[in-house]
């Protein structure tokens, strides 16, 4: 299994409970075929440019181990989740 890091920017207007539910949803998806090693909620940050007419975003960093096939499914879930504004998944160097 490879090590990955995923940065997800979600709508900053969400309630804390909604953000926790999103983190749980993505963590559960990763844990089906991999293992989450850490989740860090970095909080609201100013964006470099407006996304969906918003100047701030709530940043979440998820580090995990998974098979490469899981990444496509994870990215598909990010795309169809309305609350997700931007995301990025990168493979960590060994």
For each predicted feature, which ranges?
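Structured, basic alpha/beta domains of bacterial-type, RNA-associated proteins
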Residues: 2-94
């Amino acid at each position: 299994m490879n090590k990955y890091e995923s940065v997800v920017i979600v709508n900053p207007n969400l309630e804390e409970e909604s953000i926790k539910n999103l983190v749980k949803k993505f963590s559960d998806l990763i844990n089906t075929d991999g293992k989450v090693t850490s989740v860090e909620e970095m909080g609201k940050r100013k964006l470099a440019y407006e996304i969906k007419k918003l100047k701030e975003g709530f940043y979440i960093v998820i580090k995990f181990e998974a098979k490469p096939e899981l990444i496509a499914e994870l990215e598909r879930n990010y795309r169809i989740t309305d609350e997700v504004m931007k995301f990025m998944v990168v493979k960590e160097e060994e």
